[in-house]
């Protein structure tokens, strides 16, 4: 409908965060495909600077470059151009980062609270931390996202290594503990003697106990100091960030041609 009323040559874009261009444009003519792309704004749009412009092989590159400059100058966004691949760039790296933060916490036998204290504000991540973020998004929804990536990505992609099913997570979903929208998740609020108590899940036993505040002696972003700590927190931080960097760098030039975009 939009293509019927647009000015000839005008750019038409979708704000989808995951649906491939090849799917959205399957009913467009070859001429219309030249002017169609994806402009993925991250929420909340007012505060998030990142904007992904996803192109396809049919696009007029002059128009894509014009759109990029317009979004940077007029909208004040940090616009990057990427190819039509699963999850585009932001979600591909973001979901991998979440998964590696979770799997490394299991591997290193950290508690939910310890992992969230590190993979949180000290690493420039929202204060929810990794497990709190899982609860916020929905543990079951994240499971569906992982299945989608597993289906779409080639077997050689390192994403498969961090997307393997975790028995405890599977049990949570099956029991209705899907996060904040469910009966709880890695955290839950329990009432005892009329008082609300925040509880955290023990990753080894699967049992809940009162959540503990972990003091790692820093709440500000200080990644350099964090990864150089000679304790389990420093080792966890370095293991997570080094694997994220390694994976992200492997996506050039498949998703984008510039390392700066990553």
Which residues make up each language-model segment?
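N-terminal glycine-rich phosphate-binding loop for ADP-containing cofactors
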Residues: 1-261
